């Protein structure tokens, strides 16, 4: 089971990945995190009651890592706290992600869900984010069990 600890200006967001349901998307996020890609980036698009989006190196929603990854649509719904891959059309994701504030069933089957907040405190932090809040660091934790 793979996890991420996102340290933000507003607090800590603990995420548990859906390793089996979106293995390539998880591996991409893990690699970018381990390379320090997300460190210092902002949540550039926050819509209260909907979601917080980050992962754009330009801070505008127009950037990515320089490559695209295929969608891995799965049966995990977009619930409060769901981590999902942002994209500009099918198979155009890369580094941008969003975390839902509330259930968003209209996104099911459209975006790759690849994780979930681990606890209520993490979801509170997600909901407290505002445009421009920074990701300070992302630590990946792998449990070999």
Curated annotation (Swiss-Prot):
Entry keyword annotation includes Glycoprotein: no
Residues in PPIase cyclophilin-type domain copies: 1-145
Pfam families, per database record: Pro_isomerase (PF00160)
GO MF term (any one): peptidyl-prolyl cis-trans isomerase activity
GO BP terms: protein folding
Organism superkingdom: Bacteria
UniProt-listed InterPro entries: Cyclophilin-like_dom_sf, Cyclophilin-type_PPIase, Cyclophilin-type_PPIase_CS, Cyclophilin-type_PPIase_dom, Cyclophilin_A-like
EC number(s) reported in the record: 5.2.1.8
Keywords in alphabetical order: Isomerase, Rotamase
Keyword Isomerase: yes
Reactions mediated catalytically: [protein]-peptidylproline (omega=180) = [protein]-peptidylproline (omega=0)
Protein task: PPIases accelerate the folding of proteins. It catalyzes the cis-trans isomerization of proline imidic peptide bonds in oligopeptides.
Family: Belongs to the cyclophilin-type PPIase family.
Protein name in the entry: Peptidyl-prolyl cis-trans isomerase
């Amino acid at each position: 089971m793979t996890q991420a600890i996102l340290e933000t200006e507003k607090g800590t967001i603990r995420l548990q990945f859906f390793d089996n349901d979106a293995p390539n998307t998880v591996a991409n996020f893990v690699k970018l995190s381990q390379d320090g890609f997300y460190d210092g980036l902002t949540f550039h698009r926050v819509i209260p009651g909907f979601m917080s989006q980050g992962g754009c190196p330009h801070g505008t929603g127009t950037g990515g890592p320089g490559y695209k990854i295929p969608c891995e649509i799965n049966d995990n719904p977009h619930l409060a706290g769901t981590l999902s891959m942002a994209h500009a059309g099918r198979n155009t994701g890369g580094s941008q992600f969003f975390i839902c504030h509330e259930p968003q069933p209209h996104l099911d089957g459209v975006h790759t869900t690849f994780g979930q907040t681990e606890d209520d405190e993490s979801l509170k932090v997600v909901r407290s984010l505002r445009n421009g809040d920074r990701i300070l660091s992302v630590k990946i934790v792998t449990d070999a069990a």
